[in-house]
């Protein structure tokens, strides 16, 4: 058995539900490929698998990276979301313990994700189970399927130095400093993209090279020795928007979501830039600050989620992931689709 299944598509397209069905039917294990569902303090707002779902099927790379910077290490008021235990048949290896320990002063990278996903895939296949990779983060999926350009590890000192500089300057001032240090980045990075600006500055400061100079190396697929089968979910746009609206409205009226955000709100300034991009988090905080009503917060968040889903839909339509694309007008149509034929033929 050498198969690896990948289920990709926009948010609220039914990926997780389909993965659960396949995992239960074919002795599978689900591996996350969503850049927001890695965070351990915000499982609800990121629509991570529930505890019940994790008990039914083993899930990995969910809710295990902290949203906080190193200067909040002393805080211990947050409960970790427990991961499913690895079956004893997995060659007596506890995958969660074998995963690289991520200190909160290190930004989680795509390269780290690929390394850890591959480690789990190898162990799952060794245990004669089926790895099912599920997610909507194109950068994770593309890197896992086609490989990633390797960039030198950035030291904690450089990271802290750049973070401090970014906090002191306006975005435009920081952008200008980046262009002075790395003129090539002007062609690829916009001044509104804080995360990419910081990353490019770190690389240029440490290596004296542009981050884009590393993009000339040949890519090698981390999964080249496996039989990788990909399915891309492309629902009707109106169905997708309806799913987005309904899911967030349901989450926002659940007291657990408000509790989750209330818990992290006092430490908002310590949350990483990446984690702050979790859809809905800022709107719920505005509600807690009495700047918005809950209805206004829901409406604004829903609009942003729909816009994000639209961008994902466009990305998956245009990218050459070379998978089977499944178009559907309703969720029942998705669940009735003969995906078995796609994966096993």
Swiss-Prot record:
Annotated positions for site Interaction with substrate tRNA: 137, 159
One Pfam family per UniProt: IPPT
GO molecular function terms listed in the Swiss-Prot or TrEMBL record: ATP binding; tRNA dimethylallyltransferase activity
EC number: 2.5.1.75
UniProt keyword Metal-binding, yes or no: no
Cofactor(s) this protein requires: Mg(2+)
Alphabetical keyword list: ATP-binding, Magnesium, Nucleotide-binding, Transferase, tRNA processing
Disulphide bonds in the chain: none
Region annotation Interaction with substrate tRNA: where it falls in the sequence: 34-37, 195-199
Ligand binding (ATP): 9-16
Catalytic reactions on record: adenosine(37) in tRNA + dimethylallyl diphosphate = N(6)-dimethylallyladenosine(37) in tRNA + diphosphate
Enzyme class: transferase
Similarity field: Belongs to the IPP transferase family.
Protein task: Catalyzes the transfer of a dimethylallyl group onto the adenine at position 37 in tRNAs that read codons beginning with uridine, leading to the formation of N6-(dimethylallyl)adenosine (i(6)A).
Binding partners and assembly: Monomer.
Protein name: tRNA dimethylallyltransferase
Record gene name: miaA
């Amino acid at each position: 058995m050498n198969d690896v299944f990948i289920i990709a598509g926009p948010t609220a397209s039914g990926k997780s539900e389909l993965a659960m069905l396949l995992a239960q039917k074919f002795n599978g294990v689900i591996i996350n490929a969503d850049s927001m569902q890695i965070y351990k303090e915000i499982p609800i707002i990121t629509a991570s698998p529930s505890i019940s779902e994790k008990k039914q099927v083993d899930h990995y790379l969910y809710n295990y990276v902290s949203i906080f910077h190193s200067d909040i290490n002393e805080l211990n008021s947050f409960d970790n979301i427990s991961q499913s235990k690895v079956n004893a048949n997995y060659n007596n290896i506890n995958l969660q313990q074998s995963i690289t320990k991520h200190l909160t002063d290190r930004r989680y990278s795509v390269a780290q994700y690929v390394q850890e996903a591959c480690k789990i895939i190898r162990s799952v296949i060794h245990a004669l189970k089926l790895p099912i990779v599920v997610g909507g983060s194109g950068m994770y999926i593309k890197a896992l399927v086609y490989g990633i350009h390797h960039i030198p590890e950035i030291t904690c000192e450089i990271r802290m130095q750049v973070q401090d500089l970014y906090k002191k300057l306006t975005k435009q001032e920081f952008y200008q400093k980046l262009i002075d240090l790395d003129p090539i980045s002007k062609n690829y990075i916009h001044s509104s993209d804080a995360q990419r600006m910081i990353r490019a500055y770190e690389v240029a400061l440490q290596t004296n090279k542009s981050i884009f100079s590393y993009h000339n190396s040949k890519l090698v697929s981390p999964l080249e020795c496996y039989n990788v089968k990909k399915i891309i979910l492309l629902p009707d746009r109106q169905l997708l928007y309806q799913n987005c609206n309904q899911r967030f409205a349901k989450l926002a009226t659940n007291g657990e979501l408000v509790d989750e955000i209330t818990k992290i709100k006092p430490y908002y300034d310590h949350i990483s830039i990446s984690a702050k991009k979790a859809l809905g988090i800022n709107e719920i905080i505005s509600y807690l600050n009495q700047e918005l009503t809950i209805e206004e917060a829901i409406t604004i968040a829903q609009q942003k989620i729909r816009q994000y889903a639209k961008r994902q839909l466009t990305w998956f339509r245009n990218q050459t992931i070379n998978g089977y694309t499944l178009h559907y007008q309703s969720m029942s149509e998705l669940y009735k689709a003969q995906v078995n034929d796609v994966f096993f033929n």
